[in-house]
Amino acid sequence: MEGSSSTIARKTWELENSILTVDSPDSTSDNIFYYDDTSQTRFQQEKPWENDPHYFKRVKISALALLKMVVHARSGGTIEIMGLMQGKTDGDTIIVMDAFALPVEGTETRVNAQDDAYEYMVEYSQTNKLAGRLENVVGWYHSHPGYGCWLSGIDVSTQRLNQQHQEPFLAVVIDPTRTVSAGKVEIGAFRTYSKGYKPPDEPVSEYQTIPLNKIEDFGVHCKQYYSLDVTYFKSSLDSHLLDLLWNKYWVNTLSSSPLLGNGDYVAGQISDLAEKLEQAESHLVQSRFGGVVPSSLHKKKEDESQLTKITRDSAKITVEQVHGLMSQVIKDELFNSMRQSNNKSPTDSSDPDPMITY
């Protein structure tokens, strides 16, 4: 029962995150796992990304690396964590094959790598080479617990410094709190522009909720980097390792409740929503009683946009709460009802007691 439930849950997780299986009768399907040192060295020498700031457009992450990063991010709770990703490049695509955690000092808003983290990084990479894993470090990942996937000012500086000294390099951000609430992994992959570069107007990206106390940091730096399209893949060769890692993830998921575990996060979301409503209301009052007509019309559109975003945020909170409540009901029916039926004696009957007359 437990094994089948775990398998079903893992299949659901793979479907939720659109993880593709690369196995096929054609042997070329395994090329993604083959590391060609000659072509990678040639690519490093050619440096095509120097002539095109948008050269890298896609990221492929193995299911194993994704699950490792999610488990690591969830283990940190409300504290930020950090790790590195290993892989290779294939044209304009960065392929992440594996990931490992770093021993760093984290807070709720930032993460700091000390000397021991850099020593660990070097030793881990060298040991991997000795074990026949030739993939190089292709990026870093860290978590934003509860406030979305984007790069802060410190993240932009860190990523820009890494891109100057060890290209190609990628930044991945995971929100473990929203991952637990929504079920689907909340993740983003980014690369920064060089200083002084002005990017062209980009199409509107997928909307995400940004807390009011983070909006300024988000707005100031959002034009200094761009996001890459993220997809996932796996092979039947990963099945055993995925099973071992999934057991840890599955137990944590089954024994936790988004309604209880994310109580502080939900309270913070509602408080943030109230502040945004107050801000929108004050803007509406100002535009109603003052200003020239054209500017007031512009203000009205801006306020409508604000209200639209607030409506989206409130709908998202509602959906996540309903999702959490449904999961609790299902787990209650699945486990408690079975226990009650097992404890019920054979003489028990659901029929009503007969009437006794004297």
UniProtKB/Swiss-Prot annotation:
Keyword annotations from UniProtKB, A to Z: Acetylation, Cytoplasm, Developmental protein, Hydrolase, Metal-binding, Metalloprotease, Nucleus, Phytochrome signaling pathway, Protease, Signalosome, Zinc
Gene Ontology process terms (BP): COP9 signalosome assembly; negative regulation of photomorphogenesis; positive regulation of G2/M transition of mitotic cell cycle; positive regulation of protein catabolic process; protein deneddylation; proteolysis; red, far-red light phototransduction; regulation of L-ascorbic acid biosynthetic process
SMART domains to which the protein is assigned, alphabetical: JAB_MPN
Tissue specificity annotation: Ubiquitously expressed. Highly expressed in flowers and roots. Expressed at lower level in seedlings and siliques.
Region: Disordered, residue numbers: 338-358
The family this protein is said to belong to: Belongs to the peptidase M67A family. CSN5 subfamily.
UniProt subunit comment: Component of the CSN complex, probably composed of CSN1, CSN2, CSN3, CSN4, CSN5 (CSN5A or CSN5B), CSN6 (CSN6A or CSN6B), CSN7 and CSN8. CSN5A or CSN5B are present within distinct CSN complexes each containing only one copy of CSN5. Interacts with itself. In the complex, it is located in the center and probably interacts directly with CSN4 and CSN6A or CSN6B. Also exists as monomeric form. Interacts with CYT1 in vitro and in planta. Interacts with FLZ3.
Domain notes: The JAMM motif is essential for the protease activity of the CSN complex resulting in deneddylation of cullins. It constitutes the catalytic center of the complex.
PANTHER family the record matches: EUKARYOTIC TRANSLATION INITIATION FACTOR 3 -RELATED
Name by which UniProt lists this protein: COP9 signalosome complex subunit 5b
Species whose genome carries this gene: Arabidopsis thaliana
